[in-house]
Regions:
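Carbohydrate-active catalytic/glycan-binding domains of CAZyme proteins
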Residues: 46-570
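C-terminal motif of bacterial Sec signal peptides marking the signal peptidase cleavage site
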Residues: 41-43
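Bacterial N-terminal signal peptides that target proteins for export
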Residues: 21-31
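Short hotspots in intrinsically disordered terminal tails
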Residues: 19-20, 567
Length: 570
C-alpha cells in the first residue's frame, strides 16, 4: 500500500512506502490523513516568498528530491538549441519501479555550465517496447528494464554529430542494444537490430557499459560485473568487436581476485590529457577505512593506453560518508551500505565527481549527488594521475555553502545517525535512528521542480540519540541581522523531548557550538505539521561555512520524536 503526502505541496505529492518507515501503520495513516486535510490551510497561511522563491543554493542531491536518477554519467555537450552554449547532461537509469532497481525508461536532465543550480528535465530519451518491425515484445506491450547507461559523441569529417546511447538493456537477447540521436537530449532510436531476428540486437557490450571515442577515432568499450571486460569496437557498428581484435578479460582484477583493484561494477572511462582514467565501483576489503566491506564507493585507476595495463589510484567518493564519532571511531554518517555509480566531469575548469546515494530503507530510491574534487595529471609515459576524494555534503554545486535565508528540505541531510549504527542486509537497511525517507513525484512535478512544496524528503525516525547534519551553511549571510531564529517545520509524534541545534560538531566535547534548543511536547498535535521557532543565542558572530546539526534527546527510548520537513533561518 502507498500513501500520498499532501503536506506543503501544490502539484506534487511524494509517495512513501510503509515498509520504509519505522512506524506503526495506524500512526502513519493518521498523520497522512491529517496532513492532507491541512493542505489548504498550510498553503494559504504560508508566506508566498517562502514557498515559491527560486533557490540560489539547491543543495545535494542537486536534482529535485522527488526525482531518482542513479548511475549518472555527466558530459558537457553543446546545446543544440543555442549553438555555442554548453550544457551539462546527466544520463542515468531511472528508479521508478519502486520495488526493484531502475525503470523501463531513461530520461535526461541538463543544466547550463553557467547555472548549475538550475537543472532542467529534458524528457524521456528512450523506451524499448517494440522490436525492429515495430511490434510489441508481448501482448501487454511491456518495455525492457534499462540499467546504468553511457553516452558517447561521434563527430564526422563534416562536423555532423551523432550521439550514441548504451542503455544497459536487461533483456538477455538485447543486452548489447544501442541507440543513436542527432541531439544530446534525444530522442534516441535503436540502431543495432539483428538482421536475423527482429527481437535481437548485434553487440558485445553487456552489464554497465562504458564507451569511449579516442582522439584518433578508435572506439573502446568496457563492461562487467565482478569481473571487468574491455574491447576495441568496430566504429562502423559501435557495438561489435573490431575485426582482428579480441575481448580483454579481467582488464583489472575483480572483487574475488588478488590486488587492490577489487572491481565490482559501474564501468566509466575518461581521457584527461594523455592519460586514460577508468572509474568503477570498488568492493572495499573488510576493515578497510575502519568499516565493513562495501561496494558503496567509487575508485579509479589510470593508464597510458585505453586497454591498460592499469595503475590503481584510490577512492573518489564513499557513499557511507565516513566520519568519526565522539570517541574518534570511524562511522558511516549516512546510509551504511548500498551501491553507487558515476563518473567525473570538468566544468569551467573545476572537476566534480557525480555519484548517487540511497534513500529510504532499500536500494531502490537512489538520488543524484555531486562533490568537487581535485585532478592532477603528470603527462608523459608512466606519469601519475591523482584524484582527491570528494566529501559527502549537502552543498552540491553551492561550493561557498548553502544560503541560510532560503528554506531547504530536511531531506538534503548528509549526516543521519542513530543511538546505534544502522545495519545492511541486501537490499535493505535497518535504521535505529534518523534517515531520509524516499518520495516520488507525480505527473505534475515539472511545474515547479524546486518549489519546497514539490522538492522535499522527510527525515524520519528521529529517536533519542539521533543526529541529523548538514554540511555546510554559509552564515556570513546572517551578518548584521539581529535576533536570528530558526524556523523548523516538523510533525510531532507524541513524546516529550528536545532538539538541540549545534554548529561544527554534534558534540560539545568535539568543539561543537550550541546555537539553541527547543522542547517538543507530547501534547503537541501529532496529526498536524507545525513550525517551531527556535531562538539562536549561540549564533552571534558566526560567519563563513559551518556544519549544522540537530541532536535529538528524549527520555522515551527507541521512539521517534518527530519528522523533520524543512527549515530556514529568519
Amino acid at each position: 500500500m502507498y500513501f500520498v503526502f499532501c503536506i506543503f505541496f501544490r502539484n506534487f505529492a511524494p509517495i512513501i512506502k510503509l515498509s520504509q518507515l519505522n512506524m506503526k501503520t495506524k500512526s502513519l495513516s493518521m498523520i497522512v490523513a491529517a496532513a492532507c486535510c491541512m493542505t489548504m490551510n498550510v498553503a494559504c497561511s504560508q508566506k508566498a516568498e517562502t514557498a515559491t522563491t527560486e533557490l540560489t543554493t539547491v543543495g545535494n542531491p542537486y536534482m529535485p528530491l522527488w526525482e531518482h536518477i542513479p548511475d549518472g554519467e555527466p558530459y558537457v555537450f553543446e546545446d543544440p538549441d543555442q549553438p555555442g552554449k554548453l550544457r551539462v547532461y546527466v544520463y542515468g537509469s531511472h528508479d521508478n519501479l519502486v520495488t526493484e532497481y531502475c525503470g523501463r525508461d531513461q530520461v535526461v536532465w541538463s543544466a547550463s555550465v553557467d547555472s548549475l543550480n538550475k537543472w532542467r528535465y529534458d524528457g524521456v530519451i528512450l523506451v524499448v517496447d517494440k522490436n525492429a518491425k515495430g511490434e510489441s515484445f508481448d501482448s501487454a506491450g511491456t518495455a525492457d528494464v534499462l540499467y546504468a547507461p553511457d553516452v558517447t559523441l561521434v563527430t564526422d569529417k563534416d562536423g555532423n554529430k551523432t550521439y550514441y546511447l548504451f542503455p544497459n538493456d536487461q533483456t538477455g537477447m538485447r543486452n548489447g542494444l544501442i541507440a543513436k540521436s542527432s541531439r544530446p537530449d534525444g530522442p534516441f532510436e535503436v540502431c543495432n537490430w539483428s538482421k536475423d531476428d527482429p527481437n535481437k540486437v548485434d553487440g558485445v557490450l553487456q552489464f554497465d557499459p562504458a564507451v569511449f571515442v579516442d582522439d584518433d577515432g578508435r572506439v573502446y568499450g568496457y563492461w562487467g560485473f565482478e569481473r571487468s571486460y574491455a574491447a576495441e569496437l568496430d566504429p562502423t557498428t559501435m557495438a561489435t568487436v573490431k575485426p582482428g581484435t579480441k575481448i580483454v578479460e579481467d582488464m583489472i582484477p575483480g572483487r574475488y581476485q588478488e590486488g587492490r583493484f577489487r572491481f565490482f561494477e559501474a564501468s566509466s572511462i575518461r581521457k584527461i590529457k594523455d592519460k586514460y582514467v577508468f572509474i568503477y565501483s570498488r568492493f572495499t576489503e573488510d576493515g578497510e577505512f575502519g568499516l565493513p566491506s562495501s561496494n558503496y564507493t567509487l575508485a579509479y585507476c589510470y593508464s597510458d593506453n585505453p586497454l591498460g595495463p592499469w595503475t590503481y589510484g584510490g577512492t573518489i567518493i564513499d557513499g557511507r560518508a565516513r566520519e568519526k564519532d565522539e570517541q574518534g571511531n570511524v562511522i558511516a554518517s549516512a546510509t551504511p551500505d548500498g551501491n553507487t555509480h558515476g563518473s567525473i566531469c570538468e566544468i569551467h575548469g573545476r572537476w566534480y565527481v557525480f555519484y548517487h546515494r540511497q534513500t529510504g530503507t532499500n536500494e531502490y530510491a537512489r538520488q543524484a549527488m555531486v562533490a568537487p574534487i581535485e585532478v592532477k595529471v603528470e603527462e608523459g609515459k608512466g606519469g601519475k594521475v591523482e584524484i582527491s576524494e570528494g566529501e559527502y555534503t549537502s552543498e552540491g554545486f553551492a561550493l561557498e555553502g548553502l544560503n541560510p535565508l532560503e528554506r531547504h528540505s530536511a531531506g538534503i541531510a548528509c549526516w543521519y545517525t542513530g543511538p546505534k549504527p544502522a545495519t545492511h542486509e541486501w537490499p535493505n537497511n535497518t535504521f535505529y535512528g534518523s534517515y531520509v525517507a524516499s518520495g516520488y513525484g507525480d505527473s505534475d512535478k515539472f511545474d515547479a521542480p524546486y518549489d519546497i512544496r514539490n522538492n522535499t524528503n522527510f527525515v524520519v525516525n528521529n529517536t533519542d540519540g539521533s543526529i541529523v547534519g548538514y554540511k555546510y551553511f554559509n552564515f556570513t549571510a546572517l551578518q548584521g541581522k539581529k535576533n536570528v531564529r530558526l524556523l523548523l517545520r516538523i510533525i510531532p509524534e507524541g513524546i516529550d523531548g528536545t532538539i538541540v541545534v549545534m554548529a561544527d560538531s554534534p558534540w560539545a566535547s568535539q568543539r561543537g557550538l550550541t546555537l539553541g534548543k527547543i522542547d517538543v511536547k507530547a501534547d503537541m498535535p501529532t496529526q498536524t505539521p507545525i513550525e517551531l521557532t527556535i531562538p539562536l543565542p549561540g549564533l552571534s558572530g558566526l560567519t563563513g561555512k559551518h556544519a549544522l546539526f540537530f541532536v535529538f534527546k528524549s527520555a522515551t527510548k527507541e521512539k521517534s520524536l518527530c519528522w523533520l520537513a524543512d527549515f530556514v533561518f529568519d
